[in-house]
Amino acid sequence: LGVKVCEPGERHKESYKSAGLAAAAGGITTIVTRPDTTPAIDSPEALEFVTRRAQADAPVNVLPIAALTKNREGREMTEIGFLMDAGAVAFSDCDHVVENTKVFSRALTYARSCGALVIAHPQDPGLSQGAAATSGKFASLRGLPAVSPMAERMGLDRDIALIEMTGAKYHADQITTARALPALERA
């Protein structure tokens, strides 16, 4: 979930103007943008900057997602309440997994108290480190470093347990394997 706009940081790759024009050309009127920029959208000031830029340059509505943890490093949660006041519609560290269960649990608890949605990439980071694809025929034929589908399942199991504990609103981003479906069906 989310459009990768590279402002601030790497505007030459994708700007609010170019992303907005592409969306409008396809008949899309609203885009939701990710916080994985350089620097990350992890403070009200950074969010206000991108909001002003989007309003000035994008021909479509822009709804920003803010980072769940500072610099998307998984060590310290962001100011979720202040970021919501500044316009964040959800919180995510994108493809970075918040490995520390205590930090993730606290962030989910705080997000629940604010009514915020958390979007996470369920993955066991130890099993998925260095992988470029899910194990299988595609990865084997191309000689790609692969990760077991169980890494996604294990990450999702952890996230579901924390959601049950905290009652937070949660969206699992990038489910790529059927092995994760039993966990989703139970949830």
Residue ranges: model-predicted function:
Residues 1-14, 35-37, 63-76, 142-150:
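Active-site mouth loops of central-metabolism enzymes
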Residues 1, 26-29, 57-62, 85-88, ...:
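Short coil/turn connectors at secondary-structure junctions
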Residues 1-57:
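Metal-associated gating/positioning segment near the N- to mid-region
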Residues 1-3, 31-33, 62-66, 90-93, ...:
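Hydrophobic faces of well-ordered beta-strands that scaffold small-molecule active sites
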Residues 44-65, 109-120:
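Alpha-helix-loop-beta-strand connector modules within alpha/beta enzyme cores
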Residues 35-40, 66-69, 95-97, 172-176:
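Conserved short loop/turn motifs at secondary-structure junctions
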Residues 9, 40-43, 73-76, 100, ...:
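Alpha-helix N-cap/helix-start motif
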Residues 77-187:
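Histidine/acidic residue-rich metal-binding segments in metalloenzymes
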